[in-house]
Structure formats: C-alpha cells, structure tokens
From Swiss-Prot:
Residues found modified as Phosphoserine: S72, S883
Compositionally biased tracts (Basic residues): 850-862, 1071-1084
Annotated region (Disordered), positions in chain: 1-276, 384-437, 472-798, 827-888, 909-1144, 1156-1412
Domain of life from the UniProt record: Eukaryota
The protein's name in its UniProt record: Protein MODIFIER OF SNC1 1
C-alpha cells in the first residue's frame, strides 16, 4: 500500500489508477500492467522468467486482463497476481534468488516471493519453482495478512491449477481480481502496491518482515509489499501447485518457502530475524525444512538436505565460514532459534543436525548456534534439541551426543560439579541404599553396614570436610554398628536383651559421640536439635527396640517365617529377615525401630532412606518386616516413633551415620546428654509400647479366641468378626495381628522365645500383617512397595493363610480374616469356613479386599478380581509351595482342602448342613466361591471379559450368584440325599442367603478357591465319583445331582458355567474331553455368557436355593456330571429325573425361595441388570456362541434332546447344559429358566409360590419342567400347549431374540423365561403357562431372551425337547432317558404335576410375581 502510494515509479500512477480500479472495482488491471511493465521493462531480475510465462501473458494481460472483465474474474485476481506472478517470477525467477541474499532482497523476498507466486505461474512454465516455495509461503502469509487472502488462496488453488503459463496469466488475474473484489482495498492499496512498489524500500521493510524470511527472491524488493498480499495467495496457489516442483528444486529451502508464507512472521522471528543481518538470507533449520532462503543466492541454509546427513564444514552453501569457532556463545538461548521448535520434545522433524548443519556457527545467526564444532565429524544435535545446557553443550564445545537430546540431566553437569552429579552420587547411594535392603539383606552384616557407612561417608564425603573424619566416622560407625549388631545378634532371640543393647549407655554414648562428631565435623550447627533428635531417635529406637524388638522378635520370626513362606524369595530376608530383624531388634531397637520408622518414613525421605538403608538395611527391612508384621504394634509405636524417629532417626541417623565417626566433644557431650535423655525417653516409650503391645496382645489373644469362636460359629462368628473387624481400630487390627500372632502361637512372647513359636506367630502375624489390610501391608513395604505389598499382601495373605491353613489353624485363618479388610467377607468366610473354609475364607477376604481395592471398578472388576484373587490364591498356593515346605504343606492342605472342597465339600457342606447356619455360611462360602470360582474360571478360561460382565451381574447378585455354589450344592446334594435336612438347611440357607450374600462374597471367594480346585481334578473325580454314585449309588442322587447340576447348570451352568462354565470350560472342556467338545467350547463361551445370565439366574436360583442345595454338588458335580453326567445324562436322565427331579424339586428351597424370594426379587432386579449384562454377554454369546449355539443347536439339540431329556431329567441335561446351555442354550436356558425361573422367574415364582410346588415347579419345572412338564406335558394338552408354545415361543424367541434380548433387561429373566420357555422349562413353563398364561408370556419373553442367545435350538430345542419328550415318551434311548426323565418326572409328575399344578398355579403367580 505504501507501494501503491509510493507507487511503482513507473506504473505507480497507472497502477494507482489501476489501484483505484482495483480498490473500487477490485480490478487489479494496473497491477498487472505495472508488474508486467516492471517485468517487461526488466525491472524484475526475474524478468527472464516472466518472459517465459509471465512476461508474455503479463504483457497481454497487463491491460487486457485488467481491462477484460471476462478475464477479470480470473484476471481480477490474475492481473494482480500476474503482476505478482510477473514480479515474483522476476524476483524469484532469475537473479532474485541470489539477490535474495541481499537484505533488501531478503526483505523484498516477500515481494519477490509474491513475485515468485507470479513468477510461479511463469515458473509454472517451469522457470523457477524455487520461487514458488517462497510464493507458497507468501500465500499463507498474505492469506493471513489480507482478508482477501482466503480468496487469494481460493484463487491460489486455481492459480496453482492455472499455474501453467497461461494459467499463471489467468489465475493471477483471477487472483488479482478476486482479492481486489474481496480485498479490493487490500489488493489495491497493499498487494498491488506491493507488486508495483518493488522499488519501495518501505514495502521492503513492510514485507521483509514477512518476506524477510522468504526473502530468498529479494530481487523484487519493491514488489515485496505486493507479494505480501497477493504473493501469499499466489504463493498459496503456487505452493499448492508449483511449490512442490519449486520445493523439489530447492527442497531444503523450498519447503520453508511455503512455510515462510505461512510462518513468515514466525520464521522471521525464528529464522531470518535470528540472523542479525537481514542481508543474509535467514538460515532455516533443517528441521524446519530448508528455508525459502534456500534461494540460489539466499540460502543460508546451504546445508545438506534437512534429512540429509550433516554436511561437513563448508559443506553448507552458506558455509563461507567453514567451522567458525563458535564465536557466538555456545548456548544461544534455550528457546533461541528453530532449536526452540525442536524444543525439548526432542522430536526432530529433521535430522538432529538442524541449524548445526547450517553451521549456525556463523555469527550471522547471533544467538543461534555457535555452530557445534563437529565432534568427531559429528555435529552435535542442535542445541535447541535438548535442554539448553545439553543441547548447547555440543556447541559449547562440550561433547555432543545423543545425550544432548535426551539428557537434560547433562545440564547439571556432565562435569558440572553442580549438585546434579553430587546429587546423583547421593541419589545413587540413596537409590542403592534404597535398593540396598535387598543387597543388605543378603549381607545383613557388618559388611553391609560398612558399605552403608562407606556410602554414608561417601555421601558425607561430599558433606564432610575431611575424608579422614569420614573414614573415622566410617570406622566408628562400623565398629559401633558391629558392636551393636553383635550385641543385637547375641540378643536376637532374647529381644529384650535388645532393649539392653539400646539401653547400653556405652554404645549409645559411642553412637552419640560419633553422631555428634559427625555433626560437628559436618559443621552441623543444629547439634542440639540433632542431639534432641538423636535422643528422640534413641528413645524411639529404644522403645522400639524394646517393644518393636520384642514384637519384631515375635513378628519378625513370624514375618521371617511368613517371609520365608511368602517372602523368603521376596525379602531375601526370609529367615535371615527374622534373624536380621531379631538382630536389629537385639541390636538395639534403636536402629531397628529407627529403621522401621525411617523405613516408614525413610522411604519417604530419600536421605534418611539412604542413611537408614546404609546403616541398617537389614534393620530397615526388618523394620519393614516389623512394620509389616509388627505393624500392629508398630502401627501405633511406629507412628509415634515415626513422628519422633522420623525426625530423629532421619536427622539423627543422617547425622549419626555421616558423623558417627566424627567427634565433636562439646556437642558430643551435649549430644550424649541429649541422647541419654532420648534414650530414657525411648526406654519409656518402649515400656509404654511394650505395655501397649501387651495390651494389644491381650486384645489380640482375646480376639483370636473370639475369632476362633467365631470361625467355629461361622455366621455368628462372621457377624462378630465383621463387627470386630469393622470395629477394630487400626491399632486393634494391629493388635489383632499381634494378638493373633501371640494367640495363634500363643507365644507372641516368644519374642525372646522359640523360633517355632515365633515362626507361628510370625505366620500369624504375617497373616495378620498381610490380612491386616493395606495399612499394615503398607507397613509391609518389605517388598519395597507398600502397594505392591498390599497386593502381595493379598497374595501373601492367601499364601500365609494357606500356610496357616496347612498349619491347620483355622483360627489363624479366622484371625487373618478378622484382620482381613472385609469383616463381612472375612467373617463370613471365617464363619462359613471352619477348617476347610478358612483358607477359602482368607481367600474370600482376600478376594474381597482386592475387590474392595477394585471396587472402584465395580462388580466386574470385583469378580474379575475375585477371580484374580482366586487365581492369586492358587498362585499363592504355588508360591507357598515355592516358598517352602509349609507352603507346600499349604498347597497340599489346600489341595486336600480343594478335594474336600469338591469331593469333601459336599461332606463338608453336609457337615455344615448339619448346622444350617454353618451350612448357610458354608453354603454362602461355597456359593461365593462357586460364583467367584465361576468368575475365576471364566476369567481363567478367557471368559474374563464375559465373566467380568457376568461377574458384574454376578457381583450384583454376589449373594445370589454365590448361592449357586457348587460346594453348597454338594452339601445340598448330600443334604438332599439326606432329605429334608438339606431341604431345611436349604430353606435356612435361602433364608440366610441374603445375609449370606454378604458372606457369599467372601464365601464365594473361598468356595471359588475351593471350587476352583474342585472343578478340575477334583471335580472330575467328583464328577466321576458322584456320577458313579449317582449312577451306581442312586439314580436319585444322580438325578438330584443332575437336578442340582441342572439347577446349577441353570445356575451352576450359569454360575457353574462360570464355575461349571468354567467347569463347562474346565468341565465342559472335560466334556469336550468326554467328547462334548462342542459343549465344552460353547460351555466356555456359554460359561462366561452363561455366567452372566447364569450369574443372574444363578443368583435368582440363589434365591431359589434348591438349586443351591443341588448346586453345590452340582457345582462340583456339575463339572463332572456336566461332563460325565452329560454322558450319563441320557442314561441317568430317568434316574436323574427321579432323584434329579426330586432333588431339583426336592431341592425345593421353598424356604429358600422365601429367602430366595427376597433374594430373588433383588436377584431378579439384579438379574435384570445382570440380564442386561447377560444380554450383552448373551449377545456376545450369540455372536460367539450364537454360531456356536448354531452348531451346538445341532449338536446341542442332540445334546439338548439328550440334555433336554437330561434337562427334562434335569441333571444330565444340565451337565450338558453347561455345554448345552452353552451350546444349546435350551438346556442351559432351560437350566437358566430353572435358575432364572427358580432363581428369578421360578425364584420369584417360587418366592411367591414358595410352595414346594412352585419351587418344584421352578426346580422341577426348571430341571424337570422340560422333563416334568414333559411328563405333565405327557398330557397331550399340556404337551401340545407346551409344544405349541415352545414352537410359538421358539418362533417368538427367534423372532424376538434380539428384541427380547434387548427387550428384556433381565436377561436372567430372559434366561429364565426364555430359557425356561425354551429350555426344558418350555413344557413345564408352558404347562405352567398353560396353568398360568402370565407365565407363558414370561416364558415367551424369556424365550425371546433365550433367543437373544439365538438359541433357536433352545426354542427349537425346547420344541425338540418337547418333541423329544414326546419322542422320549415314544422313544426311550436318547429320548428314553428323556422318557425316563419324563417317566421319572412323570412318576414324580404325578406328585410333581400335582405340585406342579399347584406350582403351575402358584407358579403362575410366581411367574406373575417373577414377571412382576
């Protein structure tokens, strides 16, 4: 614009007229004319170029383009553009680039660039693509600069299109006009004058800012202003079109040229302006891409291609000063230059050799690089890459190297005595010391202390004035420590001697003297404070050495032992930890306690940590052990001591250790006095804490006793334990662990006592420590990580619990539970687990605690976590096994326990069933375990996601799902076998199931742990044995088991299929092994799928706990039975139908249903939620298992026929159901029906219909409904209805699988209804539906829900089942078992049918209720 006013001297007037036209008309005619004139007149150095393209057309279009309105659309932009183009080609075209080197031309380079845009069209003819980069750069700038630039940009694209020679003409016109229209004033006053005012230095100065960086083609200096406006546009165009070619020419710089248009201002600030001389084309970092400056004349950045290898000195075009010694200060500025762009990201857009390639040594780039002298032929990365010190260092003459990129630490000093090095040393010692506990553990002797002293000395070496003093200090400290250690080691067992050790005034005095000396030598003026701290430290140490030492003695033994079992590898302390702990304790509670405190806080305090670790890594970890194991006592003591010791021990130890060898008499005396005072205080504190520890021990013993009672009392114990655990204060918790330690061993006092007792205590304490919860586990940082130890604590907890368990102290387990975070879970676990369960309870508590930890993620995570915990438990068992004999014993005991869990669990459950409370509790545990186990297996089986989903619903129904409970089911089985007792227990259980829900979680974990093991080998054995029993001993048992399994298969299939699905996975895989591979596969899928749905229905079934009663065995048996029973199913379906029906029916936890009703209601609601998950999960299953189901439909239709028959004979179909439900959801669905019906549908039904009939209906209807209903359906009416309904349902389900799947939030219901309807439920459900049509809709809905599984086989299967049932009635083998089932069912069906009629009637209500 200044150019316009200043005007081109020649065409300025014309241009002004043109400008006027442009301004008014937005017709840049004058521009083209002037620019053409200039070019034609040879004003532009690039006129050569222009003639190629721009000149000729420029001449033509000069007035024509301007004048030609038709062209003016394009010519509008064009003329101005042509001017620009002409100018740019002129500027960029020929000599401009070299002239760009001129500062003026550098300034003009913008105009030149603009001209480059013009010349670009001319260049488009191929003249100077290099100008185009600047043009392209110009464009963005002008686009940014001028409001019309966007239009210019628009036109720019056409220009790039038209950047052909004529296109240049037209496009420039277009550009010129359109901008003039849009920016008429801008183009008129600014752009066009820019074009015209190539001579205008004002334009130059104006544009050079933008163009300066671009100033490669500065030839058109006067045009720079024009270039600013139109240039950027044209540049944009050129950049779009030609810039590529231009860039190709001068790519290193051409890239920047466009950038410069965009980033012109930036680049100027970064680049050209970085260079003091505008004359020098600004250098551009390779990373930035060769700046536009790369113009022939202007490329400072003469360096190799930005990506090219760094060029040797002088290799750069602008390297006229090859290898300048870096006259410029080595570090330009941290953000200086493009290096700033490289920024600390260290992202090199270009090779590290950015400006260094251009040796920025040239002072032209003042602050930029001194130019790194190539070190060994390597140019250090541009200083800008790293922190300035690092990056600049290479240039500063410091070693260049990748460190410059990544090593910010290099700042502090490669050589820099700056604290970084010393700090690193200190930190290194610190970190080493921090790590040293492990090393020290290995050494845990004077040598270690020597190292620690050496480190301290080394550390202090920086601090201490004299190495001699340091050496003395080291010597003194070592000797002192050795003495202390020797004393301590001598007193390890008699920890109380340890008190004497800390009480030993000579040692204390020595230490104090050394510390005082150290402080004095260190010049520490705060000797008094130090002394006070030392005194305090001594006191805490003394106290701690007394109390903590005692506890450490007991707990360290405990911990040592626990550490042996759990942590021997972990700590490397193991027994040595006990020794160490005992030693440090004996050594002087001072250092021990101090270390615990320091550990607690030393961890927080690196220096203290270093010092503490240096001095007493053993003690430190011992302290950690103490902290973990003794933390109960130490929790309070350590906290108080921590307060004292943290400061005291930190400062004192820091002081003492550093200055332990140094002597300062006055301060020494003061310090000695202070230390004596501190010692006295510490002794007092020790005494207090000892008393406190005694009190806590007494409390702990009381609690242990109480816990023992509670563990024996199960539920009562659980409640009490929950209350106690919940009520237990952290101190109480520690006390509990302490008490448990002492109680468990009853020899906590073995502080100076026997190692065995101490070991037992240690174990107990360790258990407690582990179980005490995160706080103690936090204190257990032995691992070096509180969180790790927390988690490890869980694992360790499990391991320890197992240890205890092998030790046979259920009480210890109970104790652990008490200490375990979740009183409910723990208590339930404890209460539910007497002997076998304690480990399970521990696992449950442990699982629960991880759950709590993971509660943040919710149900899914909890279950997955339960599963993980269960897995961890297993792992823990393995770890225990690894850890030692005790661990092995634990593993063995656990294995036996697991066997009991599956095989013995029935007896255990039966045993428990003798005590309905216990049974409930155990049942709950088993439930929980089954559920968790199912989760675990599912998770374990790769169903984790689904299982997680299932686990969520299951988590919702944690109680209910737990109620599905294979182990309990074995109890129930036994109970069922027992008869009403089981039934009564089941009702109790059902009644208690809610309360059990709480405990079930822990129980679930426990039982999961048990079942976890049970399902695989034991479940096999159980399956075989139980199947054999069921087959051989009694078809009723088998039927019962099968019914239970089937119920459980509904649930157990749902849950067992988590568990039985897992069992179906492990069990169904066994089935697969047994030849039910499909089912196994589907079972696995179904397992997770089923778990979900199963979890809900299972939970519902949990409500309908008859399933529970059947289910425990079924959980156990279901694996086998689902495997073998599935095989046997056909055989034993009749038997299963009898017993299974009786069981399934017999299991009639009508009472359970009452409890189950409530549970059911919640379970149903949960189930629905679960169904939603189940839906999704089922949806997945349909996706996964849907096709699988498709296949299973066939196989599972078979199986379903089998399983359906079995399902009718519910028991074997249920075993199949894990697979069949998985594969052919019908049995599974049927089971689910039963589970859902029973649990959910039937549960409510039964809950409503609590009447046995309802339960039976649910149970029998579930397990037998296919069967029993078939039996009843034997009535053509019912059967026809059922078939029709099944068909209809099947059709409906098929029609509505997704709708129902999506529709029925309660997939459990869907499972229940759909599965019921479709699954063997169909007939009974239809019969029930027949009796109660409300229920049929529910069944339909559930069928739909089932269909959500796409279990056409389910619906079809149900239909098939019905037909199969009919056929079974007609046919006897596959259908024979069905028939048998039916027959048996029918046998029962008389009563069952009656009851079922009642149940159907009631069930109708129940179904209505369930639906409601």
């Amino acid at each position: 614009m200044t150019s316009s006013t200043t005007g081109d001297r020649r065409w300025g007037t014309t241009r002004r007229s043109g400008m006027t036209i442009l301004g008014k008309v937005a017709v840049p005619k004058p521009i083209n004319l002037p620019s053409q004139r200039l070019e034609n007149q040879g004003l532009d150095p690039n006129v050569e170029i222009v003639p190629k393209g721009t000149l000729s057309w420029g001449s033509k279009s000069s007035l024509n383009a301007w004048g030609t309105s038709s062209l003016s659309p394009r010519t509008e932009s064009g003329p101005g553009s042509p001017s620009h183009l002409s100018n740019r080609p002129s500027s960029g075209g020929s000599v401009t680039r070299p002239s760009t080197a001129d500062s003026n031309k550098a300034h003009d380079s913008s105009s030149s660039v603009a001209w480059d845009s013009n010349s670009r069209p001319s260049s488009a003819s191929g003249v100077f693509p290099s100008n185009q980069p600047s043009v392209a750069l110009q464009r963005p700038h002008s686009a940014d600069t001028r409001p019309g630039s966007s239009q210019l940009s628009r036109f720019a694209e056409p220009v790039s299109e038209t950047s052909a020679t004529w296109g240049q003409h037209v496009a420039p016109e277009k550009l010129g006009v359109a901008p003039s229209k849009n920016d008429g004033f801008s183009l008129t006053s600014g752009d066009f004058p820019s074009l015209g005012a190539e001579k205008d230095t004002s334009e130059k100065s104006t544009r050079p800012q933008d163009a300066g960086p671009h100033a490669r083609p500065p030839s058109s200096s006067g045009r720079s202003v024009e270039g600013q406006g139109v240039d950027c546009t044209e540049e944009a165009n050129d950049r779009i079109g030609d810039a590529n070619s231009w860039r190709r020419e001068n790519q290193p710089y051409s890239e920047d040229a466009p950038r410069h248009c965009r980033e012109e201002g930036q680049l100027d600030s970064r680049g050209s302006q970085s260079y003091p001389n505008a004359n020098f084309p600004p250098r551009y970092d390779a990373w930035r891409g060769p700046p536009v400056n790369n113009h022939q004349g202007g490329g400072w950045y003469g360096g190799n291609h930005p990506y090219g290898a760094p060029m040797g000195p002088g290799g750069f075009h602008m390297d006229p000063f090859p290898f300048y010694p870096t006259q410029v200060p080595p570090a330009p500025g941290h953000g200086a230059g493009p290096r700033g762009n490289h920024a600390n990201n260290e992202r090199m857009f270009r090779p590290p050799m950015l400006d260094s390639y251009v040796h920025p040594r040239m002072q032209t780039r003042p602050g930029f690089y001194v130019g790194p002298a190539p070190h060994e032929g390597y140019y250090g990365p541009p200083m800008g890459y790293g922190s300035p010190s690092n990056r600049d260092l290479p240039f500063a003459g410091r070693p260049t190297g990748p460190h410059a990129y990544n090593n910010h630490s290099g700042q502090g000093g490669y050589d820099t005595p700056g604290s970084s090095v010393s700090l690193e040393r200190n930190e290194s010692s610190h970190s080493q010391e921090t790590q040293r506990p492990y090393k020290v553990l290995l050494k845990h002797q004077d040598g270690r202390f020597g190292e620690d002293n050496a480190k301290r000395e080394e550390f202090l070496g920086n601090r201490l004035p004299n190495a001699e003093k340091i050496a003395q200090q080291m010597q003194t400290s070592r000797n002192e420590r050795r003495e202390i250690r020797n004393d301590a080691s001598g007193e390890v067992q008699p920890v109380k001697a340890e008190l004497a050790a800390p009480g030993d005034p000579s040692l204390i005095q020595k230490i104090e003297g050394l510390n005082a000396k150290t402080r004095t030598n260190d010049g520490w003026q705060n000797s008094s404070s130090v002394v006070n701290r030392d005194e305090q430290e001594s006191q805490p140490r003394t106290l701690n050495s007394g109390n903590s030492a005692n506890k450490v003695s007991a707990r360290n033994h405990r911990t040592g032992h626990a550490s042996d079992s759990k942590n021997s590898s972990h700590y490397n302390q193991g027994d040595s930890a006990t020794n160490k702990n005992a030693e440090p304790a004996a050594m002087g509670g001072t250092s021990i306690f101090r270390r615990p405190t320091q550990q607690t806080q030393g961890r927080a305090d690196p220096q203290t940590k270093r010092i503490v670790n240096s001095e007493g890594n053993d003690a430190w970890q011992k302290t950690t052990v103490m902290s973990g194991s003794s933390h109960t006592t130490l929790a309070t003591n350590t906290e108080s001591f921590r307060e004292v010791n943290v400061d005291d021990s930190l400062d004192t130890e820091s002081i003492r250790r550093p200055g332990s060898g140094i002597s300062a008499d006055p301060k020494d005396n003061q310090r000695s006095t202070m230390r004596e005072l501190a010692r006295q205080r510490a002794q007092q504190r020790q005494k207090e804490e000892e008393e406190r520890a005694r009190d806590q021990r007494a409390k702990a013993l009381a609690k242990l006793e109480e816990l023992n009672r509670r563990s024996q009392i199960y539920e009562e114990g659980s409640v009490k334990n929950m209350e106690a655990a919940s009520n237990a204060s952290p101190a109480d918790m520690p006390t509990d662990p302490g008490s448990h330690s002492s109680n468990a061993t009853n020899s906590v006092e073995p502080t100076g006592g026997s190692g065995k007792n101490t070991t037992q205590n240690t174990r107990t304490s360790t258990e407690y420590a582990n179980n005490v919860g995160p706080s103690q586990q936090d204190n257990l940082p032995r691992d070096g990580g509180a969180s790790k130890q927390k988690r490890l604590g869980y694992k360790q907890k499990q391991n320890i619990i197992f240890e205890k368990k092998p030790t046979g102290s259920s009480v210890a387990t109970a104790e652990v539970f008490d200490v375990v975070p979740s009183p409910e879970v723990v208590n339930e676990g404890v209460s539910s687990n007497n002997s076998d369960m304690p480990a399970t309870s521990t696992v449950s508590a442990e699982s629960t605690f991880p759950k709590r930890k993971n509660n943040r993620n919710g149900k899914k995570k909890h279950k997955a976590e339960e599963t993980a915990t269960m897995n961890t438990t297993r792992v823990a068992v393995g770890k225990e096994t690894k850890s030692g004999d005790e661990s092995i014993e634990t593993a063995r005991a656990r294995a036996a326990e697991i066997e009991l869990g599956s095989v013995s669990v029935p007896s255990l459950d039966i045993k428990v069933s003798g005590d309905s409370s216990e049974q409930i509790s155990s049942f709950t545990n088993e439930e929980s375990q089954n559920r968790a186990k199912n989760n675990w297996k599912s998770q374990h089986v790769r169903r984790t996601q689904r299982n997680s989903l299932v686990n969520k619903p299951a988590e919702k129904f944690s109680g209910n799902n737990a109620v599905i409970w294979a182990p309990v089911h074995p109890q129930q089985k036994a109970d069922v076998s027992t008869g009403g007792g089981s039934q009564t227990t089941v009702p109790e259980f059902g009644t208690s199931s809610k309360s059990q829900h709480q405990g079930q979680t822990s129980s679930k974990s426990k039982r999961v742990e048990i079942e976890r093991y049970v399902p695989k080998p034991i479940v096999k054995e159980m399956a075989e044995q139980i199947v054999s029993k069921n087959l051989v001993t009694s078809a009723p048992d088998m039927s019962e088991n099968v019914n239970q399994k089937e119920n459980r298969g509904g649930e157990g299939t749902g849950i067992l299929q988590p568990s039985g699905s897992t069992a179906g996975k492990s069990g169904s895989p066994s089935k697969s092994r047994h030849g039910n591979g499909r089912q196994g596969k589907h079972g696995r899928e179904h397992a997770s799928w089923h778990q979900r749905g199963s979890g809900a229905p299972t939970k519902a079934l949990e409500d309908g706990q008859f399933v529970t009663s059947n289910q425990p065995i079924r959980g156990t048996v279901n694996y086998h039975s689902s495997k073998q029973t599935e095989q046997i199913a056909a055989k034993d379906q009749t038997t299963c139908n009898k017993d299974g029906w009786n069981d399934g029916w017999y299991m009639t936890p009508e009472t359970h249903y009452s409890a189950a009703e409530e549970m059911e209601s919640s379970a149903v609601g949960k189930d629905q939620g679960m169904s939603m998950h189940g839906r999704q999960h089922a949806s997945r299953s349909n996706k996964d298992g849907g096709s699988n189901y498709g296949d299973p439909k066939k196989g599972n239709k078979r199986d379903f026929n089998k399983a359906h028959t079995q399902h009718s004979g519910h028991g074997f179909s249920q075993p199949d159901l894990p697979a069949a439900s998985k594969e052919g959801r019908v049995p599974g669905d049927h089971v689910w029906h039963t589970a859902n019906r029973t649990g959910k549908y039937g549960g409510r039904e039964s809950t409503r219909d609590k009447p046995y009939g309802s339960q039976e209906k649910n149970v029998v209807g579930y397990e037998h409904q296919g069967f029993t209903t078939e039996q009843k359906t034997t009535s053509a009416d019912t059967q026809a209805q059922l078939q029709n309904r099944s068909t209809n349902k099947e059709v409906q389900v098929e029609q509505n699988p997704n709708s129902m799947f999506q529709k029925n939030t309660g997939q459990g219901r869907r499972f229940g209804r759909g599965q019921e309807s479709q699954g063997g439920w169909g007939l009974p459900a239809q019969e029930n539906m027949h009796h109660h049509h409300q229920r049929p809709p529910s069944n339909r809905d559930r069928q739909k829900q089932n269909l959500h599984y796409e279990y056409k086989p389910v619906g079809s299967h149900t239909y098939d089942g019905e037909r199969s049932r009919e056929q079974s009635k007609e046919s006897s083998q596959t259908e024979g078992p069905r028939y048998r089932e039916k027959g048996q069912g029918q046998q029962r069906q008389g009563g069952y049918q009656q009851q079922r009629g009642t149940s159907g009637r009631n069930g109708g209500h129940g179904f209505t209720g369930d639906r409601n």
